[in-house]
């Protein structure tokens, strides 16, 4: 029966980063994903300070900074009028070298991670699905569905469930996924807009009449 130390299920940002960390530490994982190709839309846009700090250890932070867009502050609007401005550098400049919000779309992030993994000899096995697995105590035996429809049994010391909200890894373990669904309907669109040039800051419109500006003490 084929084996490898770690089987990673799911090749989104979480699975890709885990695979990259392991590969750099000398552990070559097997990385599978049931989709035919990586994402082609932006989806999640923001890379936060802690992620950039971790990316710096993987020699990725500078690339993300060069390819993305730095957002130094956010402006809050109510009914078409500006009400408040939150300066990220003012809040966290003494806590991190990345005291800003970095815009770097998820699809570009995934392509960057995939390219770095391939440099280390790890590739994503697409259209390969985890059907189930059983825990043998000192190892896990995974049942996989391959792209050609054949089934494969694979043994690993660890299985990492990076397969999202409907994770079969988590379901097999009997673990719940607490939380709820927003009642509101949200749209995410990638568009090229025209109009007055913005100053590079993020703008957020709030559907409320009154806005209280909170006092933020980042020393606590």
Which role fits each region the language model picked out?
Residues 126-140:
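A conserved short coil-to-beta-strand element within the FAD-binding core of flavoproteins
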Residues 3-31:
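N-terminal Rossmann-like FAD-binding beta1-loop-alpha1 element of flavoenzymes
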Residues 40-120, 134:
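Active-site-adjacent segment of FAD-dependent monooxygenases/related oxidoreductases
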Residues 35:
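Residues in the short beta-alpha loop(s) of Rossmann-like NAD(P)-binding domains
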Residues 2-4, 148-158:
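Core beta-strand elements of the Rossmann-like FAD/NAD(P) dinucleotide-binding domain
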Residues 8, 19, 55, 109-113, ...:
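Conserved structural-core and active-site-/substrate-pathway-adjacent residues in large, well-folded domains
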Residues 115, 158, 162-220:
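Conserved FAD-binding catalytic core of PHBH/FMO-like flavoproteins
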């Amino acid at each position: 029966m084929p084996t490898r130390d770690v089987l990673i299920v799911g090749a989104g940002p979480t699975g890709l980063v885990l695979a990259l960390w392991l590969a750099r530490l000398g552990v070559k994982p097997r990385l599978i994903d049931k989709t035919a190709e990586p994402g082609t839309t932006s989806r999640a846009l923001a890379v936060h300070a802690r992620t950039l700090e971790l990316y710096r250890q993987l020699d990725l932070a500078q690339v993300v900074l060069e390819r993305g867009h730095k957002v130094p502050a956010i402006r809050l609007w109510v009914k078409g009028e500006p009400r408040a401005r939150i300066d990220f550098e003012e809040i966290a400049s003494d806590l991190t070298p990345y005291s800003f919000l970095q815009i770097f779309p998820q699809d570009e992030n995934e392509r960057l991670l995939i390219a770095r993994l391939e440099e280390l000899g790890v590739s994503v096995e697409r259209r390969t699905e985890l059907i189930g697995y059983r825990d043998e105590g000192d190892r896990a035996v995974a049942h996989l569905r391959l792209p050609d429809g054949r089934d494969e049994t694979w043994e690993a010391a660890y299985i990492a469930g990076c397969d999202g909200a409907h994770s079969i890894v988590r379901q097999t373990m009997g673990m719940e996924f607490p939380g709820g669904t927003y009642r509101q309907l949200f749209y995410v669109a990638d568009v090229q807009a025209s109009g007055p040039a913005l100053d590079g800051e993020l703008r957020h419109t709030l559907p409320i009449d009154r806005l209280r500006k909170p006092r933020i003490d980042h020393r606590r």
